[in-house]
Amino acid sequence: MTATATPVPTVASHAQDITLPPPPKGDITTPILFAQDFQKPSTGYMFIKNPPPAGVPYTNIRGEPAMVTVEDLRGKENSVNLDRDSLQVLQGLTDVPRSPEVNWNSVESVEKTFYPAVEAAIKSAIPGAHTVHIFRHGIRHTQNWPVPYNPPAMIAHLDQTGPAAINRVLRHMGPVEGPRLLQGRYRIVHFWTPLNGPVYTCPVAVASSATVKDNDIQIFVSHLGGIGGLDMPLGRPVAKPDASEQYREDFGAPRYANGQRWFYLSGITQDEALLIQIFDSNALQKDSTVQGGRAVHSAFRDPRTPQGAPDRWSIEVSCLVFSDE
């Protein structure tokens, strides 16, 4: 795919001649959507980039709001970590390229220019990580501008379950390397960063995995399309994908419960990123110090967002991370 000259959004393009206060900061209590309870044998499902059968809605999942206190990590960024919370804050990412070096509307440009820096940042942040494989990226924008980006995900979710993580390893690493890598520690980690920070609109909230119980996470099914929904144009394709291919995997939908602790990083900038851990195989080991190993997360609307604030424009890079420990 050849890079194009399509314009990309900037803060100035959305906030011309507007003097804005700093982004909202501090703890905030605000509604977050959680999936409704399903009674077996019914289960929640969602079709993504994959037309459902005639007469079938693309999803049967309905969100129900709960008032959640989201704690601000600004000034205490090191108070969370991957082993306990499945969340880590990265700062000082001056070596991660941005516009105009990266054309965000070109998959080829993102893969060649942005991916290597993300892989290096993750290896630096996660001790013992020897292999990082990016299997997709997704760009989100609150106004769907200038190309059809996805909007922020406004419902709490967990992108993959443990079995889905195993399937991802086998799918993307192949029949030889995949089983070998599954003998060590394997994880799915999202690298999330704004493309026009600081973020004012729809920041991301993440629940500490140590505070979310397994029985508070419902298991739903996502039906993903082939090229359009699973690997392209969201990221790196598998070898010779079939455009008609369909792929299904389990994902998690949490219930809100007392005792959960939710966090966000106010005014996150382009030299910062969040590592959001979706799965860590070490959490399954007896006497493991990893607590939960999976972070449910959601965008949320901050009622303190000032009028005329810039839209949120961000990228989420999904990575398989392998280590020997």
UniProtKB/Swiss-Prot annotation:
PANTHER family: BLL6449 PROTEIN, PUTATIVE (AFU_ORTHOLOGUE AFUA_3G13140)-RELATED. It is an enzyme of class 1 (oxidoreductase). It comes from the Eukaryota. Induction: Expression is positively regulated by the oxaleimides biosynthesis cluster-specific transcription factor poxB. Coiled coil: none annotated. Residues 1-25 are annotated as: Disordered. InterPro entries: AsaB-like. This is Hydroxylase/desaturase poxK. The keyword Hydrolase does not apply. Pathway: Secondary metabolite biosynthesis. One of its GO terms (molecular function) is oxidoreductase activity. Its EC number is 1.-.-.-. Keywords: Oxidoreductase. Residues 1-12 have a biased composition (Low complexity). Hydroxylase/desaturase; part of the gene cluster that mediates the biosynthesis of oxaleimides, cytotoxic compounds containing an unusual disubstituted succinimide moiety. The first step of the pathway is provided by the HR-PKS poxF that serves in a new mode of collaborative biosynthesis with the PKS-NRPS poxE, by providing the olefin containing amino acid substrate via the synthesis of an ACP-bound dec-4-enoate. Belongs to the asaB hydroxylase/desaturase family. The lineage of its organism: Eukaryota, Fungi, Dikarya, Ascomycota, Pezizomycotina.
